[in-house]
Amino acid sequence: MPAITLPDGSVKAFDHPVTTREIAESIGRKLAKDAIVGRVDGELIDLDRPIEHDAYVEIVTSNDPDGLEVIRHSTAHLMAQAVKQLHPEMQVTIGPTVDNGFYYDFAGERSLSEDELETIEQRMSELAEADHPVEREVWDREAARQFFLEQGETYKAQIIDDLPESETITVYRQGDFADLCRGPHVPSTGKLKAFKLTKVAGAYWRGDQNNEMLQRVYGTAWPDRKQLKAYLDRLAEAERRDHRRLGRTQDLFHVQEESPGMVFWHPRGWRLYLEVQDYIRRLMRDNGYQEIHTPMLVDRSLWERSGHWAMFAENMFVTESESRDYAVKPMNCPCHVEVFKQGLKSYRDLPLRLAEFGSCHRNEPSGTLHGLMRVRGFVQDDAHIFCTENQIQEEVRTFIDLVYRAYRDFGFEDVLIALSTRPDERVGDDALWDKAESALATALETHGLDYTLQPGEGAFYGPKIEFSLRDCLERVWQLGTIQVDFSMPGRLGAQFVDDDGERRTPVMLHRAILGSLERFIGILIEHYGGALPTWLAPVQAVVLNITDRQADYARSVEQQLLESGFRAEADLRNEKIGYKIREHTLQKVPYMLVLGDRELESGTVAVRHRDGTDLGSMELEELVARLSNDIAGHEREQED
């Protein structure tokens, strides 16, 4: 009979196969009430599943991330049950959890709209109120397949067909609804108290655009209504900060159907883009990088030799000319190797740092495109460092300094780091991997940086460090990376002459600080809610006349600001001054300069900040000093 070891080290002996529910009840009524599932020797199981052997058992509640995951998975089933009751003709397919929630894909001719989400939620609430037991059943494979076919659930039958023969077929039943699932699930629908359906989208069956289009309903679920409300408030704030909306209201950029996944930059947006690019360019120039530029269209033979054609061809845009196949480059690395190969290099030339604002294109599925965050055409702040094995650690250490400096200057303080090590399938011997992994880890530890180890997550050609940012909404964005590459230089024939006159293959370090400039600008816009720091703002000051009498003076003020090096505009439209102020406040222009007859006569400007602060009347020289000081504060931080 099982002896159950608990997290506090105590052991409970039972004279019969015991369930996690019984174990929880033996500890206390509150724990039994709060229990969601059990964790038995590290495996999550349903509360009523018998444990027949000695085991280490933890009672998982909604306070445990695994408990919350189960709640969300079970809520996906609850939603599927509600949809089936409302629309019996629709088929259910799959319903996994995702970050902060879940989705379920439905098939059928009927279109689900966001207007129906409230009706579905109401039915879900009724089903939760009914507190149906959720029961796990083990089925014979063929019986399960036949059951779902008889129910008209052909997708479920297809899933069963694709499962390994060794797989145990389990069905979860709640009320009149049965679903194919591995589980585990909450013990009853009454455990599902706080949920919200958020949107409807399209999705291809199994993510393959050659398959039929399904309807995906997203939702979120939390242990209680307080946590749900907090999340929905964050969601609403994220909507207010959505870079696509701010891109329109601030006249920064747009995308359109004729060029999906490509960005049309407007004058203001392009100024922001160039400011970000110029910052990185200065950083590279001051730290020993040489900027290059390589072709956008490259013959497939180079991609075949680099290995990208075999691994990445489906994501390349390919064209043909004069019986030759060309690919629009999806990345810059092979071209950088070709630049390195021009002229034999000595060990004295290493490390050689080649940087490029490389324009890349990838044929991403149309359903994944999302404003600036997921595009088909983008520019990377890409660079490749060619070095010896002994130089890896120092180059990584220096790069980490650059990463932290850049993120700090752009206003990000919370940086998360992950170190990904050797996968099972890889090139290079273990000694080389040992050296590279040790170099990356030592560089991080020398900086006193905490990092998450991701065993087996490195590329086949080398380990890597990934840098992610946490923004003001607690969202995490993966941006920077530095990756050791033992493979590509050798594949493409890159060599240098070492100190004993022998030809050697250099190690190549792939590195980027921001990654895609488009994506980083999207993150910047959302992090600041469009109110970018003055040094980044596309328009730093706008001059607003009250009547036509001040128009010439407004043009003069604008011109003086431009000549002083500021990004300024004059708004001379025949509109009420209150309307102009509101409009430019919405556009998050840092300073608004209001000119009336009093300012015209005195040669001053009335200054308002975008936060609503009235800064009073200023001489133009005083305003220039204030703007300069605002921007200089950022520059002083860069120098620290």
Swiss-Prot record:
It catalyses: tRNA(Thr) + L-threonine + ATP = L-threonyl-tRNA(Thr) + AMP + diphosphate + H(+). It comes from the Bacteria. One of its GO terms (biological process) is threonyl-tRNA aminoacylation. Keywords: Aminoacyl-tRNA synthetase, ATP-binding, Cytoplasm, Ligase, Metal-binding, Nucleotide-binding, Protein biosynthesis, RNA-binding, tRNA-binding, Zinc. Catalyzes the attachment of threonine to tRNA(Thr) in a two-step reaction: L-threonine is first activated by ATP to form Thr-AMP and then transferred to the acceptor end of tRNA(Thr). Also edits incorrectly charged L-seryl-tRNA(Thr). Homodimer. PANTHER family: THREONINE--TRNA LIGASE, CHLOROPLASTIC_MITOCHONDRIAL 2, THREONINE-TRNA LIGASE. Belongs to the class-II aminoacyl-tRNA synthetase family. This is Threonine--tRNA ligase. It comes from Halorhodospira halophila (strain DSM 244 / SL1).
